[in-house]
Amino acid sequence: MNESVRYAWFGIVAIFLVLIGAASYIQVIGAEDLRTHEANTRELYKQFGGPRGPILVAGEPIAESVPSDSTSFNYQRVYNQPELYSGLTGFYSLNYGQTGLEQRLNEWLSGTSDDLFVERLRQNLTGEENPGASVELTLDPAAQEAAYDLIPEGVQGSVVVTEIDTGRVLAMTSRPSYDTNQLAVHSTTEASENMDALVESGVSPYMNQPTADTAQPGSTFKLIDAIAMLESGEYDTDTVMDVPNSLDLPQADVPITNFGGGACAQRNSAEFTWVFAQSCNTPFSQAAMDMGQEPILDVAERFGFNDDSITIPLSVEASYFPDEELHDATLAQSVLGQVDVQASALQMNMIAAGIANDGTVMNPQLVDSVRGPDMNLLEEPQPEVYSEAISEETASQMTQMMTQTVEAGTAAAAQSSVPIAAKTGTAEIGTEDKVNSWITGFAPIDDPQVAVTLVYRNVDYSVGHRLTVDNIGTIVEAVVEQ
């Protein structure tokens, strides 16, 4: 063989090997990247028109794929009782992709999870469709409906109910809500028009309010303050404190005041439990300036503030207490749940639940179990401890003060057939006569089972206070006594 022929032969072999290698890479190594690439519209249309695992509550589907009459897609994603669950399920849309649990649980629902690999091989051999896995949620349908009914039409609000010793979410809902079916339609034009209408009406279809919408928590943040005070060793439940009606702040023109005309204006001094139950501002602000910022920040972070890693598995917007050094005047306002302090409804629920659970905070959990198409159990999340936030003794002291808040304090109207321990909060939001109204607590007091948090945004003070203190008893009775 002459030299030129030999070189040509080597070149042909090299080209052949390169082609074999490239084909192997595409077929084996790069196949998944190509399949899931955002430009692969064929795969997108295939997935959107295919079956998808259901999301279940008490065994009944709240999201499911049903056969479609469409000539383009074989299946339609359908949401049942969508207003109750839209913030949780999110939507599965050809226009807007996936949100909520549809997005967070996509590998299970679409059947692409590694745990379903053998099932996919079997389906490929038999030619069957991949129906995905089914996901059962922890929600109690009666509790979810009762919680939703506590938010009046036209009011922005959130309700969270969790099981204290496990962290299981029994109810999580909010208003304004919307019909997720409007965004799951096959027509991209119709879906776009529906999205525009939702946004114009003030609905945020990408947000689950109880986990993602943070707001100033007002005096519910005094739960954190009170724990820091008890842990300091300078206070116990009977410590007598000054209760001035006005507290001047260093380098500030506006003093801290107590609620005008309330019980705090009637006494010059009182025991800590009474101060807490009546939610007097000035003693808490003075105590914060005396203790400094660090103890309060430490307690807040033990309960979850400033932690952006919490998932349920929905991602949870981090609640915020400043970790940069604050001047005394700003600290005195911040410990009242004002200024830059922000909290989600779930965060304030974790605080109440942790106190009720002898100081142990559990990771909130929304998924009960995941099962394959053959009903084989694939995953069953177990209760997990988030933190050992406070001692059992401190938790007992906090329970005593929260109980007094309901028996003879700002939450007296929350008394019900099930004994409740709670803390109210009213956050000024800079809009005349409008506030964020909060309550968070647990029940029954002697055998805590559930933690409940309600928040109503941008409401009149009287309306918000009535909604919180009246409704916490309603939801507690609905859950505990059913």
How does the language model describe each region?
Residues 170-219, 224-457, 464:
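Beta-lactam-recognizing serine transpeptidase/beta-lactamase-like catalytic domain environment
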Residues 1-158, 173-214:
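Extracytoplasmic/periplasmic proteins that interact with beta-lactams or build/remodel peptidoglycan
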Residues 145, 461-462:
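Short beta-strands and strand-coil junctions in structured, solvent-facing domains, enriched
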Residues 378-384, 470-482:
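Short, gly/Ser/Thr-rich active-site loops of penicillin-recognizing serine hydrolases
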Residues 467:
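A conserved FAD-binding loop/helix module that cradles the flavin
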